[in-house]
Amino acid sequence: MSTTLFARDAKRFRRIDIHHHYFPSNLEKEKSNADVGWRTPAENLPWSLDISLSAMDAMNVDLAILSFPALSSGFISKDNRHTARTRNEFAASICHAHPSRFGFFATLPFLDDVEGICSLHEIAYTFDELHANGVSISSSYGEGVVATYIGDKRYDPIWAELNKRQAVVFLHGSQIPSSTPYPHPCLGLPITEVPNETFKAAAHLVVTGNRRKFPDVRIILAHLGGSTPFLASRVAVLSNHMGCILTPEEILDDFKTFYYETALSAYEPNLAAIEKFVQHDHILFGTDFPGTFTRLTAFYAFRI
């Protein structure tokens, strides 16, 4: 199931929305929005399947891949594992009821839950029993000085399992504060931090050699990779001076193995830049619905 998004089955659809969230009814979305300085469009809350289907029809989207922002903070606990399982079974039930309109990326438990192999169990369950199209992961796990980016060796067993399955991974930047506050209420974490967190995670995968160690994992970077297309060359030029053993050419080659989706990034200069950077089949369509849906979103949906 995990590879069909990039192969034969994708040809059956006019447009696939690779970045489409679902919000369970027990999620206090308004509260979590307030924590990061974001306002989900009021008409999209409380979220329902009909709201997504209506938006998909408006944008000529045939298939949406549902995902829930990864569990990037918290503790290794039964509650955390239960939350991941419940969300995955909820998403799978939607796909079962509407197989021609939805697929889903599975949510993993807090990724540090490696020692108890809970994340590995959830990977097996969601692929083998729920038929997930891939998994959704965060750029880092934990908070503050103990936050760990996803290329860390502690996560190697997870990457090894995903590599063995030739899995699709949807990588979304964490909504975590930087060491300085965001500069203005109109420039909250989704604007100032998430794009850079995506870049930091992608760059971490590259310079640690993780991307080369697990080459069969197909990684999609949310929001056109955030700042990745514009900073990849900076990594290539400077990281050797800080101990990276890869050549600049190898670094750029590894950045080009990622897939880049267009949510909140489908501005013509951005698209022109990414088309110069990666092959066209590595550029995917995404909307970030229902977190956002504006006239601009719909406008660019018809231009891609």
Place the predicted regions along the sequence by residue:
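Hydrophobic faces of well-ordered beta-strands that scaffold small-molecule active sites
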Residues: 16-20, 64-66, 103-106, 135-137, ...
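An N-terminally biased module of ancient metal coordination in phosphate/nucleic-acid-related enzymes
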Residues: 2-65
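Short, acidic/polar
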Residues: 47-56, 115-126, 268-273
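Conserved, mostly hydrophobic/aromatic
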Residues: 19, 56, 91, 126, ...
